[in-house]
Amino acid sequence: PAEVRADADACGVALEQPVRVRVSHVAKELPPALPDRPGPLTIALWSLRLRYFAARTAWNDPLPAPDIQVFALYSRLGPGAAAMPDSVGLSKGLIALTHLYGHAAAAGSNQVVLAHEVLHTLGATDKYDFATGQPLAPEGLGEQDQQPLYPQDFGEIMAGRIATSARDA
């Protein structure tokens, strides 16, 4: 809150409370899963299904309509846990679908995933190499002017990881 206020002031945002988070009810159904074989048509259809799901969920919510809807799906953490599906944030529709771990030990990484996908809804782009997951230099680094450049102590939210070298994070 104080950090958000300071960042908002630095960017010239004159809102008293630039961010407000309200937790809604548990949805009665799951949002549509990402397609197994993503292509332009399947992604477009999935996006429409997700938007429809979000609209139905908002209609059934007694709270005022949100500017951004974030759906958090929690999974088990630990041995035998399934691979986590990708999380996504849609700027058209202001909807984020996040896959998180339901364990206190994952609170930090869950917060990064939530922030990352919310920023996507606002138009932010990824700052990592899609093939390797490695943060891109310099835009994916938390301290772009640091000397020596690696290892980094901080990360760029849109990079998703903290670079320890040019090839590792």
Language-model features: locations:
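Structured segments of extracytoplasmic/periplasmic soluble domains
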Residues: 3-7, 118-121, 125, 164
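Intrinsically disordered, low-complexity boundary segments flanking structured domains
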Residues: 6-11, 54-60, 81-87, 140-148
